[in-house]
């Protein structure tokens, strides 16, 4: 039934194609010519179907009123396909189905698709590798902190510079009227007055003055807060501190008597007594109140002897200390000033440190850290106090009893020092003797002449015997004295 239906379809298609062919001819000669080469044309079409593109033919039918577009080359292919399909269907219908032929076919996996196509893998990109602002929050914080540090450095450095210049402009006239040289930087062999501050770093400025009677010179050090350091600025928010002005006057030896004296806040004096060599040795008592002399409760006194306190606390000095107590940290006069205590890992030093007759002043700048250039004018009276103290130290002299007491105190300190360092000095002397013996023995061993070497050994032996005899004689004398 299927075969007959397919055959009818083929006949209908073939008839429509042949009818369209005859419609294309205009005269009978063309029809005759077409009849002669009818099958030849189909042969040419089958041979050229691979290389030539097919032509489209439009046919119209009156009964169905439909327009169809057919390819000439496809007609034969469709006909052949129908015939092949008929024959294949006939073969499949005639042949029986063999179950054993497809045994195990469903069990084999289809590997052709996996061989031809690579497997698709989806990679999860970490969050920190994605291009978003959230991935750079650490870098943003670092850059922000760096910019804040740089801005604070510039602002803090400029503010310290303005404060230093404001202080110098305020005190310049007073300094130039009392000192011949103001502002020597020490770069030239000859002392020259530069008339400006010497910047040590971003928060410390120095000024050297000299050329005045009774003193070798005066070093002024402006110690400002580390405003250029952001961490220091944050720390000061928790614990406010003040800028300071430290003045060190080195007196001539003949223009200052022998005494140690200090006045200042109780907290500052306790700290200085622990740190400074002279205050710890000559002022061993606790700081005493200055209410007896009319000083405020915030100030205390350390003195080697009462005579020094009576002589230094005159009316003008008390006036300075009373009216500017909030700006005074400490005032320290000493003929035995050697700086802070020397701390050595191997013990006490073998000799007393060098001392200088010195006046030390430490003043607090108003503002408790929030200082402005106009606040520097409030420190000008304190510089007048320094000038007055220089003249006062030159005029003040101890009486005979005070002088003897001061000398005893210095002898006592020296004796205590020698006792503390006696063992160390003995060890140092023993090491020097051993080093000398070692050098002598090496000199004898390096001698090439045997006779000369023998004489050197005999001389060394005689020296040792003489030293031993002297030591025995001293021991006998000590025993005789003891009897």
Curated annotation (Swiss-Prot):
Residues of this chain annotated as glycosylated in UniProt: 178
Superkingdom of origin organism: Eukaryota
Ranges of Basic residues composition bias in the record: 473-483
InterPro entries according to UniProt: CCDC47
Record field: compositional bias (Acidic residues): 41-50, 60-104
TM spans (from-to): 136-156
Molecular function per GO: calcium ion binding; protein folding chaperone; ribosome binding
Membrane topology: Single-pass type I membrane protein
Lumenal compartment residues: 157-483
Keyword Protease: no
Keywords per UniProt: Chaperone, Coiled coil, Endoplasmic reticulum, Glycoprotein, Membrane, Signal, Transmembrane, Transmembrane helix
Key word Oxidoreductase present: no
Any one annotated GO CC term: rough endoplasmic reticulum membrane
GO biological process, one term: multi-pass transmembrane protein insertion into ER membrane
Signal peptide residue numbers: 1-20
Annotated compartments: Endoplasmic reticulum membrane; Rough endoplasmic reticulum membrane
Compositional bias segments (type: Basic and acidic residues): 105-118, 430-472
Main location group: endoplasmic reticulum
Subunit structure: Component of the PAT complex, composed of WDR83OS/Asterix and CCDC47. The PAT complex is part of the multi-pass translocon (MPT) complex, composed of three subcomplexes, the GEL complex (composed of RAB5IF/OPTI and TMCO1), the BOS complex (composed of NCLN/Nicalin, NOMO1 and TMEM147) and the PAT complex (composed of WDR83OS/Asterix and CCDC47). The MPT complex associates with the SEC61 complex. Interacts with VCP, HSPA5, DERL1, DERL2 and SELENOS.
Family: Belongs to the CCDC47 family.
Chain's role: Component of the multi-pass translocon (MPT) complex that mediates insertion of multi-pass membrane proteins into the lipid bilayer of membranes. The MPT complex takes over after the SEC61 complex: following membrane insertion of the first few transmembrane segments of proteins by the SEC61 complex, the MPT complex occludes the lateral gate of the SEC61 complex to promote insertion of subsequent transmembrane regions.
Name of this protein: PAT complex subunit CCDC47
């Amino acid at each position: 039934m299927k075969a007959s239906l397919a055959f009818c379809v083929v006949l209908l298609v073939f008839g429509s194609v042949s009818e369209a062919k005859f419609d294309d001819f205009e005269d009978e000669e063309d029809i005759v010519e077409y009849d002669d080469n009818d099958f030849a044309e189909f042969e040419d079409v089958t041979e050229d179907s691979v290389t030539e593109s097919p032509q489209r033919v439009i046919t119209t039918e009156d009964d169905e009123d439909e327009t169809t577009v057919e390819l000439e080359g496809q007609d034969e292919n469709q006909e052949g396909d129908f015939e092949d399909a008929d024959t294949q269907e006939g073969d499949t219908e005639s042949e029986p189905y063999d179950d054993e032929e497809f045994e195990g076919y469903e069990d084999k996996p289809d590997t052709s698709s996996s061989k031809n196509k690579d497997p698709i893998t989806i990679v999860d990109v970490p969050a920190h590798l994605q291009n978003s602002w959230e991935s750079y929050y650490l870098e943003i914080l670092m850059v922000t902190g760096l910019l804040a540090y740089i801005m604070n450095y510039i602002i803090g450095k400029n503010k310290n510079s303005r404060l230093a210049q404001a202080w110098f402009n305020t005190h310049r006239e007073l300094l130039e009227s009392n000192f011949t040289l103001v502002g020597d930087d020490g770069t030239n062999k000859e002392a020259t007055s530069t008339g400006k501050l010497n910047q040590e770093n971003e928060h410390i400025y120095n000024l050297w003055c000299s050329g005045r009677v009774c003193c070798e010179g005066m070093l002024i050090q402006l110690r400002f807060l580390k405003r250029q350091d952001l961490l220091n600025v944050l720390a000061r928010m928790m614990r406010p501190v003040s800028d300071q002005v430290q003045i060190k006057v080195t007196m001539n030896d003949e223009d200052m008597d022998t005494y140690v004296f200090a006045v200042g806040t109780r907290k500052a004096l306790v700290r200085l007594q622990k740190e400074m060599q002279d205050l710890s040795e000559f002022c061993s008592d606790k700081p005493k109140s200055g209410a007896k002399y009319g000083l405020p409760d915030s100030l205390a006194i350390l003195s080697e002897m009462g005579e020094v306190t009576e002589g230094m606390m005159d009316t003008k000095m008390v006036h300075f200390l009373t009216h500017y107590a909030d700006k005074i940290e400490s005032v320290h006069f000493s003929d035995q000033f050697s700086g802070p205590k020397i701390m050595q890992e191997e013990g006490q030093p073998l000799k007393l440190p060098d001392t200088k007759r010195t006046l030390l002043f430490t003043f607090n700048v108003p503002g408790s850290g929030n200082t402005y250039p106009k606040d520097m004018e409030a420190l000008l009276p304190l510089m007048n106090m320094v000038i007055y103290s220089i003249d006062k130290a030159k005029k003040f002299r101890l009486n005979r009893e005070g002088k003897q007491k001061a000398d005893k105190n210095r002898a006592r300190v020296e004796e205590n020092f020698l006792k503390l360092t006696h063992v160390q000095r003995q060890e140092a002397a023993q090491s020097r003797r051993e080093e000398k013996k070692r050098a002598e023995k090496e000199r004898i061993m390096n001698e090439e002449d045997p006779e000369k070497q023998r004489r050197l050994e005999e001389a060394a032996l005689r020296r040792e015997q003489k030293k031993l005899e002297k030591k025995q004689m001293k021991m006998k004398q000590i025993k005789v004295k003891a009897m």
